[in-house]
């Protein structure tokens, strides 16, 4: 039986989101979901992980939150 760690649970998905932002630039949650095929809660978990590591920026454009990699 393999054990799931927090690092593997969120870290893997954070890597997918980071790659999506790196390749596609600033994106909405919906954009990230389409590119990565992750569920909404997985994207939010990954963004939280990346945010905790200070690797992303968030900007409001109208009512939309746009996520990008920290420059």
Q: What do these predicted regions represent?
A:
Residues 18-21, 48-49, 57:
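N-terminal, helix-rich and Lys/Arg-enriched segments in bacterial and organellar proteins
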Residues 32, 44, 61-62:
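Short loop/turn and capping residues at structural boundaries
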Residues 3-14, 28, 58-71:
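Short, cationic-aromatic polyanion-contact patches
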Residues 22, 50, 68-71:
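Non-catalytic effector/regulatory segments
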Residues 54:
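Glycine-centered, phosphate/nucleic-acid-interacting loop/turn motifs that mediate DNA/RNA or nucleotide
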Residues 38-49:
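Short amphipathic alpha-helical interaction segments
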Residues 9-35:
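Short amphipathic alpha-helical interface segments
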């Amino acid at each position: 039986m393999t054990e799931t760690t927090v690092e593997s649970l969120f870290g893997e998905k954070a890597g997918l989101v980071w790659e999506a932002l790196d390749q596609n630039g600033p994106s909405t949650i919906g954009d990230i979901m389409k590119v990565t095929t992750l569920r909404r809660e997985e994207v939010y978990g990954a963004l939280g992980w990346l945010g905790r590591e200070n690797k992303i920026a968030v900007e409001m454009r109208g009512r939309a939150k746009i996520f990008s990699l920290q420059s």
